[in-house]
Curated annotation (Swiss-Prot):
It is found in: Plastid, Chloroplast. One of its GO terms (biological process) is mRNA processing. It comes from Rorippa palustris (Bog yellow-cress). Belongs to the intron maturase 2 family. MatK subfamily. InterPro entries: Domain_X, Maturase_MatK, Maturase_MatK_N. This is Maturase K.
Length: 504
């Protein structure tokens, strides 16, 4: 991002409209190409001259695209002719895929610069740890154990594409870019296909950015109003939702509040709430009563529905009591567990026992969901009985073994934070036996005869890398007593959900 900022040194008069000219500069396409190579799950092929023959960046394709954007009349092609109309040997859809990738990279630049400036002066031990999915679990273990209720919300998509354009309009003041963006979005994006999927017509990263920017907008409003929640019943705040002038009205509201409203207007105690958003969901955790939790549910849902045109389904907004209900969170089932502790205390000649109760966040593996995912991918049946993977029998033995080992290690790595690893061993057993059945089927043999011929050493590859490393870190007595299997370990290098972990 620091290297990209060097290309964007414009004077103050041009900073409001610097996006649109970037579409006609070749070095921006090089930046988008290089940015895509350094990230996972990117559509790299759109910058390649011939995907099947030679994977290299083609400046010729970029020049053709820029030339075509200059010729505005040729740019407007009916949607039904996306795949039929060719321009210099490429379909129209191909060029609009390039534009979607480029637009995502360009629009991310001002947002990333603004985000980076917000972290200035703040100290983080290791900034890259914040990118890990597992980094959120230690935070929840420390915070959720003190709370009673959690509001679990599935965040819906906007009901119309124009809402996303309006969201960007509040941040990006470049009218030319927004008109160009609106044209591409309406002409070449079918609403039925508007979802963040790998098989989306346009770049998934493009829609991820639009979705996150829209969610951040109503989150910023909610956080501001939540801080002033004790005074909202006596203060008219509807005028704040004129979105263009909202951030200016915040300052005006604060001045009026300080000068005109005494502190005694706070009829309700301002509750302490933690808000976490993850993977299309969000949770609000608090120690309030059920009545106040329903208040916040009504408050949050109506804010989003009335002012941001997103419709929440009632069955996807739930209030869970952590001591009784399980919270589905990033592939784990989390709940509060009471651990009774007996402490023996002795003062002089008198001794007595003290009963303490420790509240602990319990993270479990959703075994039913994982078995359902394994059954869907033909690793086992719906009851969890391993079956052979017939579609892999054409591969070599080493390739088959490596595939199963990789899946087993990925699942073990992700669920290393489980408080009870018994279900994890069951999953590893299913994959291990499925691997043996697949190899036996390939060699037209039975499982018993195949293992007798090759020996049990074949399955030693399933020993996870974590087991090998942890056996060297922890004392031998500690490792031999198998207490290590009850230890929860959170890794800070997990940046995405494995397909078998994501069950939705």
């Amino acid at each position: 991002m620091x290297x990209x900022x060097g290309y964007l040194e414009f004077d103050g008069a041009r900073q409001q409209s610097f996006l649109y000219p970037l579409f006609f500069r070749e070095y921006i396409y090089v930046l988008a190409y290089d940015h895509g190579l350094n990230r996972l799950n990117r559509n790299r092929s759109i910058f390649f001259e011939n995907v099947d023959y030679e994977k290299k960046y083609s400046s010729l394709i970029v020049k053709r695209l820029i030339l075509r954007m200059y010729e505005q009349n040729r740019l407007i092609i009916p949607s039904k002719d996306l795949n039929q109309n060719h321009f210099f040997g490429h379909t129209s859809l191909f060029y609009y895929q390039m534009i979607s990738v480029l637009f995502a990279v360009i629009v991310e630049i001002p947002f990333s610069l603004r985000l980076g400036s917000s972290f200035e002066g703040k100290q983080f031990k290791k900034s890259y740890n914040l990118q890990s999915i597992h980094s959120i679990f230690p935070f929840l273990e420390d915070k959720l154990s003190h709370f009673n209720y959690v509001l679990d919300v599935v965040i819906p998509y906007p009901i119309h594409l124009e809402i996303l354009v309006q969201t960007l309009r509040y941040r990006v003041k470049d009218a030319s870019s927004l008109h160009f963006f609106r044209f591409c979005l309406y002409e070449y994006c079918n609403w039925k296909d508007f979802s963040i999927k790998k098989k989306s017509i346009l770049n998934p990263r493009f829609f991820l950015f639009l979705y996150n920017s829209h969610v951040c907008e109503y989150e910023s409003i909610f956080f501001f109003l939540r801080k002033r929640s004790s005074h909202l019943r006596s203060t008219s705040y509807e005028v704040l939702f004129e979105r263009i002038l909202f951030y200016g009205k915040i300052q005006h509201f604060l001045k009026v509040f300080i000068n005109s409203f005494p502190a005694i207007l706070g009829l309700l105690k301002d509750p302490f709430i933690h808000y976490v958003r993850y993977h299309g969901r969000c949770i609000l955790a608090t120690k309030d009563t059920p009545l106040l939790m329903n208040k916040w549910k009504y408050y949050f849902v109506n804010l989003c529905q009335c002012y941001f045109s997103v419709w929440f389904q009632s069955q996807k907004v739930n209030i869970n009591q952590l001591s009784k209900d399980n919270l589905e969170f990033l592939g784990y089932l989390s709940s509060l567990r009471l651990n009774p502790l007996v402490v023996r205390s002795q003062m002089l000649e008198n001794s007595f026992l003290i009963d303490n109760v420790r509240i602990k966040l319990d993270s479990k593996i959703p075994i039913s969901s994982i078995i359902g995912s394994l059954a869907k991918d033909k690793f086992c049946n719906v009851l969890g009985h391993p079956i052979s993977k017939a579609v892999w029998t054409d591969s070599s033995d080493s390739d088959i073994l490596n595939r199963f080992v990789r899946i087993s290690r990925n699942i073990s790595h992700y669920y290393s934070g489980s408080s009870n690893k018994k279900n994890l061993y069951r999953i590893k057993y299913i994959l291990r036996l499925c691997c043996v059945k697949t190899l036996a089927r390939k060699h037209k043999s039975t499982v018993r005869a195949f293992l007798k011929r090759l020996g049990s050493g074949l399955l030693e590859e399933f020993l996870t890398g974590e087991d090998q490393v942890l056996s060297l870190i922890f004392p031998r007595s500690y490792y031999a007593s198998k207490r290590l299997y009850r230890v929860r370990i959170w890794y800070l290098d997990i940046l995405y959900l494995n397909d078998l972990v994501n069950h939705e």
